[in-house]
Amino acid sequence: MSPRKTYILKLYVAGNTPNSMRALKTLRNILETEFKGVYALKVIDVLKNPQLAEEDKILATPTLSKILPPPVRRIIGDLSDRERVLIGLDLLYDELADNSLTSTLMDALEDADTTDSDS
């Protein structure tokens, strides 16, 4: 099986508000569950670093950006729905594609075993 991709993410928040902290907690939970060891997350407080928000054209918080692997994807607002976050960042598709590839390979191996035993 191919090595897993490394995911580079940026979470833009506005201070230590309950909404920002909830977004960070939920996101860390998703990443540790689904992508443990293959992600880097940078949290950017736009109140402390407004120039970074301006450079990256961030207009609202929380905003989550997937930088790598391409394409860049963003989710703005509520990050509490795990599936919405994964789909919005094209991460669920990657997860399903990896599982689909594994399933396809397993099916092919089973078919080969069946064909060999029939002959």
UniProtKB/Swiss-Prot annotation:
The keyword Signal does not apply. Pfam families: KaiB. SMART domains: KaiB. InterPro entries: Circ_KaiB, KaiB-like, KaiB_domain, Thioredoxin-like_sf. Keywords: Biological rhythms. Coiled coil: none annotated. GO terms for biological process: circadian rhythm. The keyword Zinc does not apply. It comes from the Bacteria. Key component of the KaiABC oscillator complex, which constitutes the main circadian regulator in cyanobacteria. Complex composition changes during the circadian cycle to control KaiC phosphorylation. KaiA stimulates KaiC autophosphorylation, while KaiB sequesters KaiA, leading to KaiC autodephosphorylation. Phospho-Ser-431 KaiC accumulation triggers binding of KaiB to form the KaiB(6):KaiC(6) complex, leading to changes in output regulators CikA and SasA. KaiB switches to a thioredoxin-like fold (KaiB(fs)) when bound to KaiC. A metamorphic protein which reversibly switches between an inactive tetrameric fold and a rare, thioredoxin-like monomeric fold (KaiB(fs)). KaiB(fs) binds phospho-KaiC, KaiA and CikA. KaiA and CikA compete for binding to KaiB(fs), and KaiB(fs) and SasA compete for binding to KaiC, thus the clock oscillator and output signal pathway are tightly coupled. Has 2 forms, fold switches to a thioredoxin-like fold (KaiB(fs)) when bound to KaiC. The KaiABC complex composition changes during the circadian cycle to control KaiC phosphorylation. Complexes KaiC(6), KaiA(2-4):KaiC(6), KaiB(6):KaiC(6) and KaiC(6):KaiB(6):KaiA(12) are among the most important forms, many form cooperatively. Undergoes a major conformational rearrangment; in the free state forms homotetramers as a dimer of dimers. When bound to the CI domain of KaiC switches to a monomeric thioredoxin-fold (KaiB(fs)). KaiB(fs) binds CikA, leading it to dephosphorylate phospho-RpaA. Belongs to the KaiB family. This is Circadian clock oscillator protein KaiB. It comes from Synechococcus sp. (strain WH7803).
